[in-house]
């Protein structure tokens, strides 16, 4: 089968579109013919080896955390799925990914794919949708009537977060630029702050929110200012760089990494099919173009990585110093904007 793989950690140039062995299902697994996968900045982090101390990969590695496709084979012990079922899943980061024609995946990770959108487009849902859900309802414990600031609402996670928070009955203030402002408003935001006109902290000076959800890359100083916007007893939840606790005011600071959860993904799919949740796809490309997609995201990813290294220090900072080309490769023409779906 055809797949994109990398045989060593590094920049986008280590990604190779090549022949790879077709997987067979293990016990409790199914094989899925991939209809689509999508790019996430986490894919660049794994490719660059930034977390190899915590999450070493067996090389060569097939990337692609998001999966949408059709089951073609069942492993021993799988009874709840059938060949021909259309499914979506968030794959383990250290397992072979969906940037291939076929992938083996645990049956327990699967959810039935939405039937109201194209199957390939459904690959834009798992990681970012689950991250938004878990940030809001597991970590922030968002309740109806609470106020929330979503910083970076124009991002892929932000789009889902605005929709879910509004549907939960929260009062949503969202930051967005001119490019995404109308879309974010259509998702249910009660108020839009244009960060390009006035810095967020300045625009919201003196206001407080039960929850601040940080989706934009930021350094420790900016995160500290955002924590100041959290009401006493509230939560600062970040999916980018961590923020400081404010124990004196009872403010919790949580750093979120999205994880696979089939039940939550099933709920997200149900909302898509009910017309309550919009899957936004900015671009559709052939899988062979994945290296170009990584290159187009290089500028944004480099900033995220460098800010994370400033915030965390330690091994991550050392790794960036040792191999700066892994994250600072020149971006290709045309910066990556929105969610990109890739099809074999």
Give the positions of each predicted feature:
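Residues located in well-ordered beta-strands
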Residues: 2, 16, 33, 68-70, ...
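A glycine-/small-residue-rich N-terminal strand-loop-strand element
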Residues: 68-92, 169
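C-terminal hydrophobic helical "lid"/dimerization subdomain
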Residues: 1, 265-344
């Amino acid at each position: 089968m055809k797949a994109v793989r990398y045989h060593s950690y590094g920049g986008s140039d280590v990604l190779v579109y090549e022949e790879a062995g077709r997987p067979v299902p293990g016990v409790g697994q199914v094989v899925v013919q991939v209809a689509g996968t999508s790019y996430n900045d986490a894919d660049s982090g794994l490719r660059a080896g930034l977390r190899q101390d915590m999450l070493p990969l067996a090389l060569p590695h097939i990337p692609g955390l998001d999966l949408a496709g059709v089951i073609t084979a069942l492993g021993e012990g799988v009874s709840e799925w059938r060949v021909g079922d259309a499914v979506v899943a968030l794959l383990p980061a250290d397992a072979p990914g969906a940037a291939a024609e076929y992938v083996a995946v645990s049956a327990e990770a699967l959810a039935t794919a939405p039937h109201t959108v194209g199957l390939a487009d459904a690959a834009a849902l798992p990681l970012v949708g689950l991250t938004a859900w878990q940030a809001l309802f597991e970590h922030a414990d968002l309740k109806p009537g609470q106020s929330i600031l979503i910083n970076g609402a124009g991002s892929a996670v932000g789009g889902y977060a605005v929709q879910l928070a509004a549907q939960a009955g929260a009062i949503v203030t969202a930051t967005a630029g001119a490019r995404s402002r109308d879309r974010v408003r259509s998702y249910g935001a009660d108020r839009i702050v244009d960060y390009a006109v006035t810095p967020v902290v300045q625009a919201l000076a003196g206001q407080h929110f039960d929850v601040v959800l940080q989706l934009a890359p930021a350094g420790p100083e900016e995160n500290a200012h955002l924590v100041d916007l959290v009401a006493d007893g509230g939560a600062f939840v970040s999916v980018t760089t961590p923020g400081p606790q404010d124990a004196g005011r009872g403010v919790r600071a949580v750093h979120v990494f999205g994880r696979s959860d089939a039940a939550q993904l099933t709920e997200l799919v149900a909302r898509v099919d009910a017309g309550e949740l919009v899957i936004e796809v900015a671009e559709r490309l052939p899988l062979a173009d994945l290296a170009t997609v990584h290159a187009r995201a290089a500028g944004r990813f480099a900033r995220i990585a460098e800010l994370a290294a400033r915030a965390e220090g330690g091994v991550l900072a050392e790794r960036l110093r040792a191999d700066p080309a892994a994250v600072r490769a020149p971006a290709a023409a045309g910066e990556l904007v929105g969610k990109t779906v890739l099809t074999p």
